[in-house]
Amino acid sequence: SSFFLNLINNRQGDYSRYIFFYLNYLIDNNKLNEARLVVEQIDYINSTLLLSQSKSWIDKEKFDDFGKIFSCKDHNDLVSEFLFLISNLYSSQDNFEKSNFYLNLSNYLNPKFEFNLSLVAENFFLNDEFDKVQRILKNFKKEDEFYYWFRLKTEAKIIIQEQDYENGIKYIDSKFNKIENPNIKIIFDLANFYKNSKNYEKAIDRYTEIILRLDDNSLIKSDVLYRRGGSYERMGNYEKSDEDLLHALRIDPSDAYILNYLAYSWLERDYKINEAMDMLKTAYDLKSNDPYIIDSIGWAFFLIEDYEEAEKYL
């Protein structure tokens, strides 16, 4: 079991499906306390849809729901999962036609695992086939809160694509307001919606709501502070922005993206130039292959008129 517990905290890859199957195994063998211990280590905000829904089921003692969608003893279910993994691989390579082909085979063998249809919806969305997306989304019902929220988010994104951000935000707002005691992950998603639509004041309010619920040294808190700090920065409230970003770095001083964001903000304001350059160099050392950070350090040298160094990165 320690192997699966380590997977939960592994930041190098997505092992969420393995953890789901482990939970399924534990519940099938009536090891409910072990299953509870596993989900205690899962954070809703950083988890995938499948793991968030699994954690919710266990938190609500809905253990039977696991067996309703998958059984390790059913050969069709096992082959279906193998086909789903192939489909997921093709999707990651933007080969949506082959991805959907294997997904259809997977769904044929195990139609109970309707959550897998979220990948079909994503494939069709990326191909701008919004009518097909809408039909698939109808499979996700209110009782499965995270997949239902995925449905609402995707419907809002379609409205944004077909109309505009304003109507998309109105839609997601109206649906969110009908949710009783929304999970912290749902609040986080809503805050990100606001930030992406440049509704920074609303985003800040929601991020603040989340921050107040998190432990002081949580890495998730660092991420939310980063997002709120970025919202303040976009509004021109640099004092609040710096406060949040520095707080985030006290929690996680090796986060290259926070270092990069704060340093570049300072350089643009002609503020703490030497310290900003040091932070950018640290960010580059941490993520030397990241195009975003390479571009930032190149422009930073350009801003301080060190054109020879800038040319190495730009």
Locate the predicted segments by residue.
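TPR alpha-solenoid repeat register
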Residues: Y18, L51-S52, N116, F150-R151, ...
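Short coil turns that delineate tetratricopeptide repeat
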Residues: Q12-G13, S47, P111, E145-F146, ...
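Residue-level recognition of tetratricopeptide repeat
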Residues: N24, N88, E122, K157, ...
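Structural motif corresponding to the intra-repeat A-B loop/turn of tetratricopeptide repeats
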Residues: N29, Q93, N127, E162, ...
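TPR-adjacent "capping" and linker segments in tetratricopeptide-repeat scaffold/adaptor proteins
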Residues: G67-F82, D215-S222
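Hydrophobic/aromatic packing residues within the alpha-helices of TPR/SEL1-like helical repeat arrays
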Residues: F4-L5, V39, L103, L137, ...
